[in-house]
Amino acid sequence: MDSNTNENNSHASSNERQSSEGHDDYLNRNPNSEATEGEEGTHPTTGTQPVAFSIGTMFIITPQANFEGGENDPFANPFQPPVKRAVKEAWDSFEPLSNDQLMDLTCPICYDDMNENDEKQATKMPCGHIFGKNCLQKWLENHCTCPLCRKEVPHETVGSAHPPILFIIPHSHTLRGNQGNTAVSQENASNGVHSDFHPSEELNNANTDGRTGVDEPARQLHRIAFNRIRFILAPNRSATNTPVENTHPENPDSNTSTPTTRSEPLAGEGASIDAENASSRQETTPSDSRPSTLTSLFNAFFSSMPDRPSSNEPMTSNLTSNSGSMTNSTSTDLPTSNLPSQNAPARPVEPSPSIQPPNLLNLPTASPESTSWLPGSQTNIPANTNRSERPFTQLMTFHGLPSLADLPAVLESMFRPSGNNNLLNLNGIFHPDHNAQTENGQTLPENTDDTNSNATSAVPNLQNLNQQNAVTMGTNTPNNGSSPAVHPVIHIYLSRPPLQPAVSEQETPSEAVSREGTRSTDATMEDSSRPPSNGSFQGPGITHLSEMGQRILQRFQEEMENRMNQTRSESSTPAQQSAAGSSINVDTAGRQPSDEINIPGEYENSSEVAGSRNQTPTHSSIAVDTLSNVAVDQPAISTPSDVVGSDAGDTSKVSSGTSTPRMAAPIARRSNRHHPYSRPSSTRPQCQLEDQGICDPNDRFVHFECGHSVHERCQQSTSNSENQMDEEIGECPKCRNEEHK
């Protein structure tokens, strides 16, 4: 039990270093309210704070078509395995042939005639096979064998474990830097990042100044798009030449190496890394830490962030300064089972709260005195650190443009019950009305009474829980009678080369539903990805990524809020059943907020919700009968008339409080709804003599006492053909025919 507590404390303490006063103000800021004069440092807070999001676009410059990289060319694709290609000297051993020397003029690759021009010159390889020059050249750019017999030629291994250039452009609403923090201002100035930059103001100034100057809007948009670019340049790569005598082509020499893991023992409590470990860490060559995947690239990017403490400051980090992978310390209990590895899956990358995220939004960084990288069991954590004000961070990376099908997988990784990244169990409470968990994992019962005791019963339990966690971590929690909320910050990045064709409309997710009430602090985002005037990037790709990011961000927020509501209702069901017993009379109008699932926006109070299968039922479309614990107003599934028997009035028993999907359990058929395969009923009369083929749909009907209806002309024609008497014309012809039979 203590090990689990220390494990959670280690994750929570490792996330404390990214917070500061400006960071908390940014998370607590409400976009719908403006701070008045004299109240610049105060922000209105509510019972449940929204989740703070940030989204950015990553552009990775990769080689283009017909790429002929030399030995010192750094622009090689880092996401592909090393390629063995033929060297240029291998062409010296190839023999050009004329038409007289050829038995067949057809190229085995393109099936075109050879020797029509210089590009289709017939070329004979040392193995004896003949191909067109252009086809053979394209093949040997990525291969070192004959296309037919697979015999090798002199080749070189081309591949680079280093990323070429990484651009990260944030799209989110940014915050002004802390003007009082001179150290941060100097650091941002040295990195080319201005702390007083505000995208919305720059955009407004660009629109207003555009009337006076023609080049002013382009200059302002250029600042918006590229003023906050963080990039990484890759060192030169080298190609490994392999002679033709190599008899093991399946095991070539590759310059890709796995970063070594170095343990850094600590001298004692509150002690820093000694000089020997620091010097050995500085002497690490770049070949020891070459990230080969995007996950490793992020790890290297985090470990080399300029926001980290300088070398002369006492460092307690368990991350090496120039290594691209996570390293463990022998004196700590920090788990690394869920950390990204060198060969991790491409999508989605597992979020890790143990990694420091990049300071993309230019938020004020934490000072070295208030930074702690050690678990909560260590004693070098500052006493003035408040855990409740330290938001934790989750990093999510997508290769390409993620579809809506990827969101459930991301939510599962965030809400799984036993995961280290669980938003509900990460050593804190997401917001005060969530279910609290004690140290042994038991759920605290919630008071279901309608009196004011509900507001005073759950809060002290949460407060005591926070105080216990604070004592364990060595922090001080203010005793203000309320439970502080933990604000997770989720960074979502979209990775896509800018020169690829834009994704079609079929691949883009649908427009997000407009929601009412409190929005996220990053819901209002500017299109900061417009291309500059020099045309180094293609505009449609960047603009498309910006629009995609906004839609994905809004949809992700909606999916997360719906999932949180479902989790809250499911977690409150066992506590309610244990407190309520078999049956409790509870007024439906006075139910607890945890018993309701609200979906704001156009789904609320809408008649179309009943026809949707995947939407969560709202409190306006479901009424819970507390006496029998039965949902009596669930949407029905219509069945054919011959299937429904005498039990048409029965209703399916659906337990209250459970998040059962709509139309999951069939109930009684409604009289005004019909199965699509059932015979449609109609109030229009039907002629009983239509089988004779003389009916006119526009003719008038004649109704008889027996209930049959016949067209007037059909009746007259039948009577005339049978030579009936005038007194028998009023008889139904259908009944008369049945009597004769």
Swiss-Prot record:
GO terms for cellular component: Dsc E3 ubiquitin ligase complex; endomembrane system; nucleus. A zinc finger (RING-type) spans 107-150, 687-736. It is found in: Nucleus. Residues 316-332 have a biased composition (Low complexity). The keyword Manganese does not apply. InterPro entries: Znf_RING, Znf_RING/FYVE/PHD. Pfam families: zf-RING_2. The keyword Metal-binding applies. GO terms for molecular function: ubiquitin protein ligase activity; zinc ion binding. Keywords: Metal-binding, Nucleus, Repeat, Zinc, Zinc-finger. Residues 18-27, 731-741 have a biased composition (Basic and acidic residues). One of its GO terms (biological process) is cytoplasm protein quality control by the ubiquitin-proteasome system. Residues 1-50, 177-214, 238-387, 500-543, 561-619, 638-688, 713-741 are annotated as: Disordered. Residues 1-17, 177-193, 252-263, 277-302, 333-344, 357-386, 563-586, 604-619, 652-661 have a biased composition (Polar residues). Gene3D superfamilies: Zinc/RING finger domain, C3HC4 (zinc finger) (3.30.40.10). PANTHER family: FINGER DOMAIN PROTEIN, PUTATIVE (AFU_ORTHOLOGUE AFUA_3G12190)-RELATED, RING ZINC FINGER PROTEIN-RELATED. This is Uncharacterized RING finger protein C2A9.04c. It comes from Schizosaccharomyces pombe (strain 972 / ATCC 24843).
